[in-house]
Design a protein with these regions (language model features):
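Active-site neighborhoods and metal-handling regions in enzymes and metal-associated proteins
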Residues: 1-275
Length: 275
């Protein structure tokens, strides 16, 4: 049972800006064999019919007293089960995009067990296809190119917000679909946090500007940051930069088939710890 936009898009190809609204839940049931089944609010039915799915069920929504739960319950009860259980997005880095009240109601009334199915989703999604790799490579490439060209667009006196917007516009112009994540923070010699901002703080001589981005193309993200020095960077900043550069190079060399993320982390962390 899938309810989140990311997993529904992965298994069906369906994407919608309407997911920004929390009013309506959307459901996709992936059986052990055969095509997925969509149970969606009426407003999304026509577009779902353009996907590769054959079975699309809908209900008139908003309808707070029954937002698709009756339809979902009957679907779950009628599909063939081998082990008498249905997996759901209950595990790590997963959420259920439906009212918790409705989830409790579903668990109490459906004649099958709802269990954590996140391991199955992880096992499938961790292995990328060639088409997925192409999309990830594309969004990472254009973000990297935009980062590389940003210094020519920045100057002392700009604000954090102005600097971030210049990067965001460039990434979009290069072909990204959206830039949902781009914190920008600055400070003398470095920054104290990397999750908030930007603000209207003015960039001055000696400042370090940190910008991170999670930009997307066709549902796939890049996720990396860059630091920019304004005026003259201190010797301490230059030393830290050199260590991080070396750690990154070692991490790239450690990222080989068969290695784990733990292996890559340890290789990089060893360099940083010895700083």
């Amino acid at each position: 049972l899938l309810t989140t936009p990311q997993n529904i898009r992965y298994f069906t190809g369906y994407d919608s800006q309407f997911w920004e609204s929390p009013t309506r839940p959307w459901f996709v049931v992936v059986p052990l064999s055969g095509k997925p089944i969509a149970i969606v609010p009426e407003i999304g039915e026509s577009e779902f019919q353009k996907t590769w799915l054959d079975e699309i069920k809908s209900w008139t929504s908003p309808r707070p007293e029954d937002e698709g739960i009756t339809l979902l319950k009957s679907t779950l009860e009628n599909i063939k089960k081998t082990f008498g259980q249905i997996g759901a997005e209950f595990g790590k880095e997963m959420t259920i995009r439906m009212p918790v009240r409705d989830l409790f109601k579903l668990k109490e009334t459906v004649n099958t067990n709802l269990v954590d199915g996140s391991d199955a989703i992880w096992d499938i999604r961790m292995i990328k296809t060639e088409e997925e790799i192409k999309r990830i490579k594309f969004i990472c490439s254009i973000a990297s190119d935009a980062y590389n060209s940003l210094p020519s667009k920045l100057s002392i006196g700009d604000t954090e917000r102005e600097a971030v917007n210049k990067l965001k516009i460039d990434i979009l112009n290069r072909g990204a679909d959206s830039v949902p994540f781009m914190p920008g923070i600055s400070g003398v010699g470095g920054v104290s946090q990397i999750v908030c901002g930007p603000t209207n703080r003015t960039l001055n001589d000696g400042d370090i500007l940190f910008i991170d981005t999670g930009s997307t193309f066709d549902g796939y993200f890049c996720d990396f940051d860059r630091n920019f020095a304004f005026g003259k960077a201190s010797s301490e900043v230059e030393k830290v930069y050199e260590v991080l550069w070396q750690a990154t190079e070692i991490g790239i060399n450690a990222a080989i088939p068969g290695a784990t993320t733990f292996d890559v982390f340890n290789a990089m962390n060893k360099v940083i710890s010895e700083m």
